[in-house]
């Protein structure tokens, strides 16, 4: 069997990394010699293919002159190597051994008979080979291009070999199989354990793949067939080729937008997931994942690398970028804002917008530069994740809600449904949290102090204790109450931004009123904060939570007898004022004049046009996109025809209500300027993807991160997994690899590494 040496009385295993193991040769004559010298009768009736696939001999059975170490990492046999060193008698001294291979001593007549049989079989095979060689196919000759030099046999074999390696890597990516099979601390010292890549490679060898078998039949089996460096280079090429398929469509579409998701941990390093939005040839708005960018702590360096990667490495022309959006958690918001501003300086039409997949209130809360807010948001996410760990925890919370809201069954039912969803990303998340807080505290207390009837394991009880301590801290109470009240002014506005196209259009007109309300709050912050603090105090009293200043501040004030600072004034200066100021400024930044002009152009959508009684002025707002139009001089006349078309439509014709519907109109090609404008508006990150089939990039990204352990994540394999349905050209991957590494030592013509323990 492959894990054991096939020689009689030899108990060595191929998992020992300090000793090379070799396959039986597939050459009939050499294989026959190996079998004869082994003196194992049970191997005589097996074919060379079977022996090559299932049996091994360790290096102890070969003269040292037969073993060639071409480098410290490569051990191979010479072409004429024959095993000659065997122990055929030690089993006689231990007749009771249960784990020795049984040996049948062959007589000279038996050996001569077997030799004659093997010679006859070899002769028949040679005759068949000669017959086939005398009748070559004419088609192969005709297919040769006179202007291209034909590949040598070695070059063809090397390309087929590389193609097999790339096939395995693509398979591993699509099926989300990590490269490493075992953790380093799982493998005992001195043992060889193949990684997942090598295991799949050996599987294909044993399944009869000729190219791989020929390449590795003389190579020690307990070696790395493909080094980590080679694997990394091939993975980079796989990633690049798969990404290029998407980027080619983006370039054909011309216009696109860039979106980044929250920073993620890839094998211990922080990365930014990057997605692109574009309209494909079938007029469908698509949002596709194109890769990870290493995150930089310095915002200016991050901005430079972000731009360089997109333009130089990925080959996108940022002159065609019409939108940019960044979904990040609290600690990264300010840095991504620097990235956005640097891109805007170079490309003014790359409008900085909100992303449709993130609620405005959630986005604003994450951007608030107050430590207490960041801590509170993290606690909220942990509480939600805790109760979603198991159905039993959600049922426990449901029962507490039923008791607390027994006089309002409808509200109880509504809250239960909300708790079973990912409610932390909702527009009204803080209102929900304030309503649920008592139920959450009582439920967590119940888990901590559960009686013998309901038992939770130590981990659940421990997490419940930590979370209960966090949500019953007065600092947390004040923070969520202030956020609830401040963000109540933007809730309806944000909800409309994620609504229908007409809702988005009219939301743009309501921004002035929202800012006016927030400015009024800022002017009267003393009064507003007094009400907010009173609400927080009442909630704390209801939950029997002591009202106190944060411990860090109290320790700093020790010995300061002149300090007259109260809890109310402390939270006004450190929480309410900076939060309101930041939200006002953030709304002004995210809804710039260009952004609002773009949203005003949504009156091109026929249903919006109808609500405005066809009295619209798109031409004025569309000036910013004039250079994007195929025939800008005819825009005015074309817009007039577009309005007349829908104003005088038939009674049975409904007005298209979305950009998606308008782009798929059969006669849209007769309105080239309108079509161009709709395409540009469609790719703005603030516009939602109407057809969910084309929003797979983000969903698959979330699924990959959810289903893959942090230390097993790979930025290369992630792209293959997320874009598993994108076609791939193995020949292109092979040609690219040969072009890049043909003169380098890591080209897999020297491909085996023996694992040494130094």
Swiss-Prot record:
Annotated stretches, region: Disordered: 116-141
Gene Ontology MF annotations: DNA binding; protein dimerization activity; zinc ion binding
Ranges annotated as THAP-type zinc finger: 1-86
Keyword Oxidoreductase assigned: no
UniProt cross-references to PROSITE patterns, sorted A to Z: ZF_THAP
Origin superkingdom: Eukaryota
Alphabetic keyword roster: DNA-binding, Metal-binding, Phosphoprotein, Zinc, Zinc-finger
InterPro entries cross-referenced by the UniProt entry: DUF4371 (IPR025398), HATC_C_dom (IPR008906), IFN-induced_PKR_regulator (IPR052958), RNaseH-like_sf (IPR012337), THAP_Znf (IPR006612)
One term under GO cellular component: nucleus
Record-listed Phosphoserine modification sites: 563
Stored Pfam families: Dimer_Tnp_hAT, DUF4371, THAP
Signal sequence, start to end: none
PANTHER family linked: 52 KDA REPRESSOR OF THE INHIBITOR OF THE PROTEIN KINASE, 52 KDA REPRESSOR OF THE INHIBITOR OF THE PROTEIN KINASE-LIKE PROTEIN-RELATED
Record function comment: Upstream regulator of interferon-induced serine/threonine protein kinase R (PKR). May block the PKR-inhibitory function of DNAJC3, resulting in restoration of kinase activity and suppression of cell growth.
Record's subunit section: Interacts with DNAJC3, probably sequestring it.
Protein name per its UniProtKB record: 52 kDa repressor of the inhibitor of the protein kinase
Species this chain originates from: Mus musculus (Mouse)
Gene name of the encoded protein: Thap12
